[in-house]
UniProtKB/Swiss-Prot annotation:
It is found in: Virion tegument; Host cytoplasm; Host Golgi apparatus. Plays several roles during the time course of infection, including egress of virus particles from the perinuclear space and secondary envelopment of cytoplasmic capsids that bud into specific trans-Golgi network (TGN)-derived membranes. Plays also an essential role in the maintenance of host cytoplasmic viral assembly center (cVAC) morphology in primary host neuronal cells. Oligomerizes. Interacts with UL7; this interaction mediates UL7 incorporation to virions. Interacts with UL14. GO terms for cellular component: host cell Golgi apparatus; viral tegument. Pfam families: Herpes_UL51. Residues 178-244 are annotated as: Disordered. Phosphorylated. Signal peptide: none annotated. Keywords: Host cytoplasm, Host Golgi apparatus, Lipoprotein, Palmitate, Phosphoprotein, Virion, Virion tegument. This is Tegument protein UL51. It comes from the Viruses. The keyword Magnesium does not apply.
Length: 244
């Protein structure tokens, strides 16, 4: 009777509680290198680095890591471009592109500062909203894939940095890829001599005689005879010089 009442009222011995450890989701092996690379580029800009568990804690954290990776890569690309543009010395080499180089530097500096501020706002601010960075992330990705910098500006930057075959120093002018034309030194341009081609002889026709044209004979006046001077010899014609 007591056992029946105990079973009904739950007075019996309780079974031992067993716990099962819940394992965290492990990313696939093919995605781990990309995640490690994303963590590396993002942690390089954060004062307090994040771990892989922090980045994969939830779907929102994973999305935040993807956005931060795009911003970090854009930031590093801007810094590399700024370093290369800094090699241009305004006023000394190619002064006509000083304005374009300064405009590129201002644009790259603003984009780099905005990327850095957005990454810090995403990870360091309390209650940061990810949607505030969506527009900037899309612009950063678009600027890397479809940059609004046209090819003429790229050519200007290459000429300023000396990265292409176009010669800028010394006032040389470029006549094409790999061809540099030196500036004129004030000498008049002498046209090449004209060459007249004789008509080709047909089959059976005789070839023209290659003899030069006859030069006019110029007679030299005979000096006046003198009783004491020796008798001069016969007059000679002036030599015929071709081309006169």
């Amino acid at each position: 009777m007591a056992s029946l009442l105990g079973a009904i009222c739950g007075w019996g011995a309780r079974p031992e509680e067993q716990y099962e450890m819940i394992r965290a989701a492990v990313p696939p092996s093919e995605a781990e290198p990309r995640l490690q690379e994303a963590l590396a580029v993002v942690n390089a800009l954060l004062p307090a680095p994040i771990t892989l568990d922090d980045a994969l804690g939830s779907l929102d954290d994973t999305r935040r890591l993807v956005k931060a990776r795009a911003l970090a890569r854009t930031y590093h690309a801007c810094m590399v471009n700024l370093e290369r543009l800094a090699r241009h010395h305004p006023g000394f080499e190619a002064p006509t592109i000083d304005g374009a180089v300064a405009a590129h530097q201002d644009k790259m500096r603003r984009l780099a500062d905005t990327c850095m501020a957005t990454i810090l706002q995403m990870y360091m601010s309390v209650g940061a909203a990810d949607k505030s960075a969506d527009v900037l992330v899309s612009q950063a990705i678009r600027s890397m894939a479809e940059s609004d910098v046209v090819m003429e500006d790229v050519a200007i930057a290459e000429r300023a940095l000396g990265l292409s075959a176009f010669g800028v120093a010394g006032g040389t002018r470029s006549g094409g890829i790999g061809v540099t034309e030196a500036p004129s030194l004030g000498h008049p341009h002498t046209p090449p001599p004209e060459v007249t081609l004789a008509p080709a002889a047909r089959n059976g026709d005789a070839l023209p005689d290659p003899k030069p044209e006859s030069c006019p004979r110029v007679s030299v006046p005979r000096p006046t005879a003198s009783p004491t001077a020796p008798r001069p010899g016969p007059s000679r014609a002036a030599p015929c010089v071709l081309g006169q």
